[in-house]
Regions:
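Residues in well-ordered beta-strands of folded domains
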Residues: 19, 35, 53, 92, ...
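Oligomerization/assembly interface segments of phage tail-like spikes and tubes
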Residues: 45-57, 62, 105-115
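Short glycine/proline-enriched loop/turn "hinge" motifs that connect secondary-structure elements
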Residues: 41-45, 100-103
Length: 116
């Protein structure tokens, strides 16, 4: 499952919690949430659209965490592409995605992954 592969990878690289859903009991000011928002399969090779939301106590902290996530996702020598089950990592977009309901600062990056 690409979600668990991505979660384990980011946990090994980041110093903040990596979650698959928001934990209402958590008091962490910085964390990331990963979510699969789509997927396809072509010639028996699966692909996935993954979003990674980076949360911070300030807009700057959220943006800085987003940049760190992007660096680890896209690095050719130590990034996600080095994981055996992943054959392609592309950044589709990233943007300020502050949650106006909860007033929490976050950025969101959208990736297209090809995996096995």
């Amino acid at each position: 499952m690409i979600e668990t592969i991505l979660k384990k990878f980011l946990e090994s690289k980041l110093s903040v919690p990596v979650l698959m859903e928001q934990d209402p009991k958590s008091t962490a000011s910085q964390f990331v949430i990963i979510e699969k928002t789509g997927g396809a399969q072509k010639n028996h090779i699966p692909s996935a659209i993954m979003t990674i939301q980076s949360y911070g106590a300030s807009k700057y902290e959220a943006a800085a965490l987003n940049e760190e996530v992007k660096r680890w996702m896209l690095d050719g020598l130590e990034g996600l592409i080095t994981v055996d089950e992943v054959s392609s990592v592309n950044l589709n977009s990233d943007y300020d995605f502050t949650d106006t309901t909860t007033k929490r600062y976050r950025y969101q990056a959208v990736y297209e992954l090809t995996h096995y």
